[in-house]
């Protein structure tokens, strides 16, 4: 009998599925276009997006994440976004527990 995936393995599977869901909207499931990025941010990270006071923040994020400057995010570039957000959330959590 096969073992069930661990919580970490399920998280990885979820990240892959979310990337594929958003990358596949325009037919290319290997990269997220700018339009797909905006949809991703407004649906999957809606609270983060809605809390931004600067309307240009998403454009700047896309440019900063797009390391090869092709106007799209591959899976590694997508993971850089997720990792950066996870670090920021962890830092916030640590600060809140030290009060």
UniProtKB/Swiss-Prot annotation:
**UniProt keyword Iron-sulfur present:** no
The listed locations are: Cytoplasm; Nucleus
Q: What is its main location?
A: cytoplasm
Q: Which Pfam families match?
A: EF-hand_1, S_100
- Specify the superkingdom: Eukaryota
Q: Which sites bind Ca(2+) 1? A: 29, 31, 36
Question: SMART domains this protein is in?
Answer: EFh, S_100
Q: According to the UniProt entry, which residues carry Phosphothreonine?
A: 8
For this chain, the Swiss-Prot or TrEMBL PTM comment says: Phosphorylation at Thr-8 significantly suppresses homodimerization and promotes association with NCL/nucleolin which induces nuclear translocation.
- EF-hand domain: from which residue to which, for each copy? 10-47, 53-88
Question: Which positions does UniProt annotate for Ca(2+) 2 binding?
Answer: 66, 68, 70, 72, 77
Cite the CDD domains for this sequence: S-100A11
Q: Which GO terms describe its molecular function?
A: calcium ion binding; calcium-dependent protein binding; S100 protein binding
| GO BP annotations, alphabetical order | regulation of cell population proliferation
Checking PROSITE patterns in the record gives: EF_HAND_1, EF_HAND_2, S100_CABP
> Which keywords annotate this record?
Acetylation, Calcium, Cytoplasm, Disulfide bond, Metal-binding, Nucleus, Phosphoprotein, Repeat
- Where are the N-acetylmethionine modifications? 1
Anything further noted? Binds two calcium ions per molecule with an affinity similar to that of the S100 proteins.
What this protein is reported to do is described as: Facilitates the differentiation and the cornification of keratinocytes.
Q: Whom does it interact with, and what assembly results?
A: Homodimer; disulfide-linked.
The identity of this protein, by name, is Protein S100-A11
Which species is the source of this protein?
Answer: Sus scrofa (Pig)
């Amino acid at each position: 009998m096969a073992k069930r995936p661990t919580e970490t393995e399920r998280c990885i599977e979820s990240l892959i599925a979310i990337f594929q869901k958003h990358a596949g909207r325009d037919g290319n499931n290997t990269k997220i276009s700018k339009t797909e990025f905006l949809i991703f941010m407004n649906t999957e990270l809606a609270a983060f997006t809605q809390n931004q006071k600067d309307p240009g923040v998403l454009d700047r994020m896309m440019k900063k994440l797009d390391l090869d400057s092709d106007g799209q995010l591959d899976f590694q570039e997508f993971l850089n976004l997720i990792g950066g957000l996870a670090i920021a959330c962890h830092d916030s959590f640590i600060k809140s527990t030290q009060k």
